[in-house]
Amino acid sequence: KAREMIQELYRYYNRHANRMPKEYLELIDQKAQPQERVVCDYIAGMTDQYAIDRFAEIFIPKAWRG
Protein backbone atom coordinates (compact mmCIF):
# COMPACT_ATOMS: atom_id res chain seq x y z
CA LYS A 1 0.00 0.00 0.00
CA ALA A 2 2.78 2.43 0.85
CA ARG A 3 4.40 1.93 -2.56
CA GLU A 4 1.10 2.63 -4.31
CA MET A 5 0.58 5.77 -2.23
CA ILE A 6 4.04 7.08 -3.15
CA GLN A 7 3.47 6.24 -6.82
CA GLU A 8 0.19 8.15 -6.80
CA LEU A 9 1.83 11.15 -5.12
CA TYR A 10 4.60 11.04 -7.73
CA ARG A 11 2.10 11.00 -10.59
CA TYR A 12 0.06 13.76 -8.98
CA TYR A 13 2.98 16.12 -8.37
CA ASN A 14 4.36 15.51 -11.86
CA ARG A 15 1.00 16.64 -13.26
CA HIS A 16 0.51 19.41 -10.68
CA ALA A 17 4.02 20.61 -9.90
CA ASN A 18 2.57 23.98 -8.89
CA ARG A 19 1.25 22.29 -5.72
CA MET A 20 4.79 21.79 -4.41
CA PRO A 21 6.52 24.38 -2.19
CA LYS A 22 8.08 27.39 -3.88
CA GLU A 23 11.69 26.25 -3.46
CA TYR A 24 10.98 23.12 -5.52
CA LEU A 25 9.22 25.10 -8.22
CA GLU A 26 12.24 27.39 -8.48
CA LEU A 27 14.49 24.39 -9.19
CA ILE A 28 12.19 23.41 -12.05
CA ASP A 29 11.88 26.98 -13.36
CA GLN A 30 15.64 27.50 -13.28
CA LYS A 31 16.09 24.15 -15.03
CA ALA A 32 18.51 23.22 -12.24
CA GLN A 33 17.07 19.70 -12.28
CA PRO A 34 14.47 17.87 -14.37
CA GLN A 35 10.95 18.07 -12.96
CA GLU A 36 10.85 14.30 -12.35
CA ARG A 37 13.97 14.55 -10.14
CA VAL A 38 12.55 17.50 -8.21
CA VAL A 39 9.30 15.60 -7.57
CA CYS A 40 11.31 12.59 -6.35
CA ASP A 41 13.32 14.82 -4.02
CA TYR A 42 10.17 16.46 -2.67
CA ILE A 43 8.51 13.13 -1.92
CA ALA A 44 11.72 11.61 -0.52
CA GLY A 45 11.90 14.48 1.96
CA MET A 46 8.40 13.82 3.30
CA THR A 47 7.93 12.12 6.64
CA ASP A 48 5.61 9.13 6.60
CA GLN A 49 2.85 11.11 8.29
CA TYR A 50 3.24 14.09 5.97
CA ALA A 51 2.99 11.79 2.92
CA ILE A 52 -0.13 10.15 4.37
CA ASP A 53 -1.66 13.56 5.08
CA ARG A 54 -0.91 14.83 1.55
CA PHE A 55 -2.34 11.65 0.04
CA ALA A 56 -5.53 11.98 2.09
CA GLU A 57 -5.86 15.67 1.22
CA ILE A 58 -5.48 14.98 -2.50
CA PHE A 59 -7.26 11.67 -3.03
CA ILE A 60 -9.76 11.05 -0.22
CA PRO A 61 -13.01 13.04 -0.35
CA LYS A 62 -13.45 15.19 2.76
CA ALA A 63 -16.83 13.63 3.56
CA TRP A 64 -15.10 10.23 3.97
CA ARG A 65 -12.53 11.49 6.46
CA GLY A 66 -13.24 11.32 10.17
Ranges and model annotations:
Residues 1-66:
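Histidine-centered, transition-metal-coordinating active-site segments
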